[in-house]
Every structure is written in C-alpha cells, then in structure tokens.
C-alpha cells in the first residue's frame, strides 16, 4: 500500500515537468544506464521531489525498499548540474559512510571527473564545481556556512534532528527552489520525523508533501520472508518496520 498526501504526485510512472522541474537531467535515461526500474515508492519520491510545487518531501517507507539508494541517486543527479551543492545527512558517522561509498560507486560507474575526494571530511567535488557533502546530526555545525540546492536526511527518524534542521540547516536552503528530502522508516509518532511527515497532509504547509509505503511496494520481498517476520516479531514491531506505521509506539 502506498499513501501520498498530494493528489498531483503519482507513484505508477515518472512524471514530466518540462518547465520548472527540479531535476534538470533526464531521469529515465539515467536510471536506464544503471539498470534500475524504480518501484512505486521510489517513483513517488522522485515525482514529489521533482514537482516544482513542493520544496519539502517526507517519505516514510518500510525496510529494504532502496530508500538510501534512491536518495543518493537523486543527490548525484542534482550534482550533475554545474555549481550545485548537495548535503546528505545521516544520524551518525557510520551511516554517513554508506552514502559516501554509494556516491563513489555512482561516480565510478559514470566515469565522472572528480577534483576533490576528501574521505576525512566526506566531501566530493566534481569538475563542474558541484559538491556532494556528507554530514551527521551529531556534528551538524561542520556543514553549515554554505548554501545547498538539496538536503537529504536519510534514516531521519533514528535521531532527533529537528534542531539540526530548523536551526542549523533550514537557513542554508536560501537558493531559489532549493529543497529538502526526509526519508526513513518510522520510529513512533511523537518525534520530529512524524511531525514533518504530517505537514504534508496539512493545507497549512502547502510546500510540503509526504509519502508512506508498506512492504507491499517492494517487489524483491518474498512472501515466505514476510510470513517468517510475522511469526518472529511482535505485531507492533512488524507494523512499524514492514507497514511503515507511525502509531504503534510513542
């Protein structure tokens, strides 16, 4: 099951926004070169981010749907436009390394020219003067002081990142049409990720959009694995991890 807050965001096919789309390069061709056919949750995320009406996209997605992978793909697509700056935020240093490694793999796959690859600071600079920077919530001060075209919060619900975004990072989205993507499996209903997610369903926040996708949207999951998970996990645990349900834990 997939639930999208805004009716003009589709999940069954990639949408075209010829005039003001956020991702300037052809997405379909890029995905074809990677051999990727996006699942419905990934398609919804792409369409929501690409839609010029929305600046803030929240995606509550069950486990193993390729959310970190598609987030990194979107980050690199934006970086292919000269002088673009992308920030990939993670809860901690270890998780930021996953995105750093993914970016290196994508760069190698497309044989992009890199003029700086700083493993210590986790910054990659391409020959077109675009930068892809990794950051962690517990060291957010190290990534302020610059403007970003796209900020991606991966596994956002795993840590309290509200202050990191509102105080440190929201002011860095000062470019016209700069955007933020928050993506995670839920971790209860009384936290910042849930608050941001429900903004997408409110007319009070017209620039926000949200998506929730359960395990049914993952074509790679087997029915036998789902049956085993249901037997070995509590109902609340299963609903959170596989149904992307906010309401099972506080």
For the regions a language model picked out, list residue spans one by one.
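Phosphate/NTP-binding elements of NTP-utilizing enzymes
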Residues: 2-250
